[in-house]
């Protein structure tokens, strides 16, 4: 039977995060006709609610020293635990600078080096303790995208969700207020800059359009079926379909089937339900890295929901600043609280054959001085503690409210306070890494005291914390140009993927700030080039 089509274009891009918009921008700039479809009513996906930082480890824009490919590869290999595709990682590292130049030349998006932001494991071989590998999207005047400014994804979000304290918040507002225009920052700026480039090329994303089926045969993918306005339409793709649909962290069945441990909750928009993954699997796509996610510790405030489900907030300042620790039900610490967030999944997922997950549940425990000096998750310094803080004058009372063993916690606090007096953490090395103090107390007299401080001022507080995710990291396996590979090992003709819709190329590794968006844009760029050239 001859296929009938409602629409036709060269390249269909599904999703409008950094990966999808980059792919669409490149494909259109290279001469292909492009149609972009977005499941949500707004554009930007997870990128729009992120920090808008990209990690490009061998770019040529850093001040004070050259960033080399060799150092970047050495660094990623040192933290990969052997789960890394060397060819794809090298492709990412080598292509990054070219992608930056191309995107800046073909869109309104511009980048600047995030000076001083260290790599996440800077002491490893090839690491950068002084930073330089992460780049920010520059502030962007939203007036340039007209009515689309109000159609970029946003959360009912406050700065506590992204780990920005009152001082930094004030600096951001002051800088933006000094600009002449309606400027946005972070992930919103990244999306707006890419979107402006696409709009200038005559490509307008179609929203509330959910892709439900890839159309094709053994000879390749020829189009996609999309639900739009209550009916199905069939869109022919003369060259390719590019999946930029995000991960599967909001689909409980897929989470339970694939992730290597419990997921407390995602911090991404709730549209990431594995649509691209399912469509690719239906055509025999090989899968990789399915047990992994971009992990992050999260707190859920009672009664706070998103899409009818508990809303998760990432915690960074709260666990890094002095006078707070994380303990399990036995009252024992089990990790470096100030360490980079992705690696915390290992301790949270520690499984005892007899006791189950010994570090889940867990709590952030802090004292009155911490709350007075730093605040906590949107509560300003010196603010009133809400009921869900589990305020207790004694450790025995804290045990009654939370179940944390009082004797175990007392022993932990004694050992902790003794160690802090010597400015060391002999158990987990908190304060030893250049990264540990980055989100700490910058007014502290020594680097160690940016994150180390005693817990000795009642009342005490205990807030439940678990491991969440910014997105999943597994999906269809691809080649160096983003072509989705069949289980046979051969590319599926006409099908590409990028971002969290593809298997993460760095395996378990998370290089630094922007370690998600850097690869997403690089492989979106390469997929766009390859798709347009078919």
Regions found by a protein language model. Give the residues of each.
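An anion/pyrophosphate-binding glycine-rich loop and adjacent beta-alpha core
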Residues: 122, 126-130, 139-166, 277-279, ...
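C-terminal structured subdomain/cap of oxidoreductase catalytic cores
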Residues: 6, 25-26, 35, 233-240, ...
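Glycine-rich active-site loop/strand segments that organize a redox cofactor
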Residues: 56-92, 153
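Beta1/beta-strand and adjacent pyrophosphate-binding region of the FAD-binding site
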Residues: 5-17, 35
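A glycine-rich dinucleotide-binding beta-alpha-beta segment and adjacent secondary-structure elements
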Residues: 213, 217-220, 408-505, 509
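Glycine-rich FAD pyrophosphate-binding loop
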Residues: 29-48
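Glycine-rich loop(s) and the adjacent beta-strand/alpha-helix scaffold that form part
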Residues: 181-188, 229-304, 351, 517, ...
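Conserved redox-cofactor binding core of oxidoreductases
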Residues: 93-229, 300, 420-448
